[in-house]
């Protein structure tokens, strides 16, 4: 099994194969980002704030190219808060104004109050630039892998190690 590593040319080919897999995944992610006009075209629901519409662990697909249509009340959007790294998935409950100057107020379906406490200090409403995208599709529970990897960091090392071994030890 490990004898295939004895040949330097074969080991280099396996390493290149592994690098090709990683770079292909990266290019697919970047391509999807360009197509959807969203820095994060796929996100995972991390909390129960949107139940019953979305459960923790659901994988959401976003679209941010609404050139002819504005974000409307009732639409589920994903937004970033200034100086915070975690995207938030909530529903638009109020809209003030139109176009690029529109201000949005959001709230989780399972929350008692709106999101004003979650916004950046001094910010009362979201602007269009805060929106990462609108939810257009979802896959239930597929995102639990991401949640497990973030809650148990050692699993990342184990998974990467197994993937690396599979690529290196694979016979052609």
UniProtKB/Swiss-Prot annotation:
Membrane topology of this protein: Single-pass type II membrane protein
InterPro entries assigned to the protein according to its UniProt record, in alphabetical order: LexA/Signal_pep-like_sf, Pept_S26A_signal_pept_1_Ser-AS, Peptidase_S26, Peptidase_S26B
KW Endoplasmic reticulum (keyword) present: yes
GO biological process, one term: protein targeting to ER
Annotated segments matching region C-terminal short (CTS) helix: 158-169
Cytoplasmic-side segments: 1-14
Catalytic residues (UniProt): 49, 90, 115
Annotated compartments: Endoplasmic reticulum membrane
EC assignment: 3.4.21.89
Superkingdom field: Eukaryota
Lumenal topological segments: 36-172
Catalytic activity, reaction form: Cleavage of hydrophobic, N-terminal signal or leader sequences from secreted and periplasmic proteins
GO molecular function, one term: serine-type endopeptidase activity
Residues that carry a glycan: 111
Keyword annotations from UniProtKB, A to Z: Endoplasmic reticulum, Glycoprotein, Hydrolase, Membrane, Protease, Signal-anchor, Transmembrane, Transmembrane helix
Gene Ontology CC annotations of this record: signal peptidase complex
Entry's transmembrane regions: 15-35
Similarity comment: family membership: Belongs to the peptidase S26B family.
Chain's role: Catalytic component of the signal peptidase complex (SPC) which catalyzes the cleavage of N-terminal signal sequences from nascent proteins as they are translocated into the lumen of the endoplasmic reticulum. Specifically cleaves N-terminal signal peptides that contain a hydrophobic alpha-helix (h-region) shorter than 18-20 amino acids.
Assembly behavior: Component of the signal peptidase complex (SPC) composed of a catalytic subunit SEC11 and three accessory subunits SPC1, SPC2 and SPC3. The complex induces a local thinning of the ER membrane which is used to measure the length of the signal peptide (SP) h-region of protein substrates. This ensures the selectivity of the complex towards h-regions shorter than 18-20 amino acids. SPC associates with the translocon complex.
Domain remark from Swiss-Prot or TrEMBL: The C-terminal short (CTS) helix is essential for catalytic activity. It may be accommodated as a transmembrane helix in the thinned membrane environment of the complex, similarly to the signal peptide in the complex substrates.
UniProt name for this protein: Signal peptidase complex catalytic subunit SEC11
Gene (name only): SEC11
């Amino acid at each position: 099994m490990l004898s295939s590593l004895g040949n330097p040319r074969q080991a280099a080919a396996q390493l290149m194969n592994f690098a090709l897999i990683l770079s292909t995944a990266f290019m697919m992610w970047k391509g999807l980002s360009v197509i959807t006009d969203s820095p994060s075209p796929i996100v995972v629901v991390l909390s129960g704030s949107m139940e019953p519409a979305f459960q923790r662990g659901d994988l959401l697909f976003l679209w941010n190219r609404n050139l002819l249509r504005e974000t409307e009340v009732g639409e589920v959007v994903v937004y970033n808060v200034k100086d915070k790294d975690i995207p938030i998935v909530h529903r638009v409950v109020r809209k003030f104004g139109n176009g690029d100057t529109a201000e949005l107020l959001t709230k989780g379906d399972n929350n008692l109050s709106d999101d004003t406490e979650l916004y950046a200090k001094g910010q009362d409403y979201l602007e269009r630039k805060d929106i990462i995208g609108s939810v257009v599709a979802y896959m239930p529970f597929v995102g639990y892998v991401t949640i497990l990897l973030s809650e148990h960091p050692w699993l990342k090392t184990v998974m990467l190690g197994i993937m690396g071994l599979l690529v290196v030890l694979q016979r052609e």
